[in-house]
Amino acid sequence: MTCLLLLASLPLWGQKQYTDAQDLTFCGKIFNTTRPYERIDPLEEMTDGEKGQAKLPCGLMVAFNTDSRAIGVRVVWAATAPNGGLYGPIAARGFDLYMKKDGKWRWAGNGYPKQTAPGEPYEITLIPSTIDGEKECLLYLSLIAKIESLEIVTDKGSRIEPGPAPFKGRIAVFGSSFTQGSGAGRCAMTWEAQLSRATGYNFMNFGFSGNSKLQSYFAEALATADVDAYVFDAFSNPSPEQVEERLEPFIRTIRKAKPGIPMIFIQTIDREKSSFNPAHLAKIQSRKQMADKMMREMTKKYKDVYWVTTTSATSEEHEATSDGSHPDSYGYLLWMKSIKKPVMKILSRYEIR
């Protein structure tokens, strides 16, 4: 009996089958793109850095149902995949697999290819042996490794089909490296990914590390998006002068194109780095003060514009940071919890399906 139980738990890979991820339910995209694993076709006005970030798959997901006991992926990188750095390898070039249990998304497995060179297929197992029967699955893609092609690997002869949309509505989240996910240990641990799983609403990652500065071309692009709401992490990157100059034109551009669509701005977070660095503390405080001043004016002037000031990624123990500026995965959980109630209260006023 012991031997039989051991054999039942071993990896089941023998013969395999490969399903193009594009034939399943692909979600998390705000814009249609020429290349499927990019978030937006690069805009002419973008800097070279922003054009590179536009090609990242952060926030993209694949939903599918399968009765396979083993599940993996086969990926071809579009460019040399990063080793990790601030992200860690699972967040940078890995994949997070979730499955539904008792109506909630639960982590099921993850992994990342050791190989980083582009142009060759690399295969990894995410879960070698899971429960019998049909599983509702959600696969989160790498945050910063550019993907050329992706296939879901399952047992040969198993059934795999597109899954239902995992979350309702379409809510664009434009922001900084915090929104992109810098410092997260896994690709499913950005604050907006956690907010989606916690609420059932579809918060879509449009983070541009270091480059969320209320640029007019981002406003023009977002104004064309087919969305039910916007959330903006808009004050983590720009200087107070940029906020004062750019905020109202940014709002006006989107409001003109999307009247009646809620625009929710959230305050930036405090950084642990400020604890022993007075100059850095003054820098962050000046940003927050200008953001608060301007947003109080904007919420009075424009309908359906909201200001959420409860954002926090600081733990009671001050142990939720990856580098003094960016939260770690736990810090992003705290961020999500800090804004969940006010954001959902605002969204409850609107019909989001």
Where do the model's predicted regions map?
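A general structural detector for well-ordered alpha-helical segments in enzyme core domains, enriched
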Residues: 191, 246, 250, 287-294
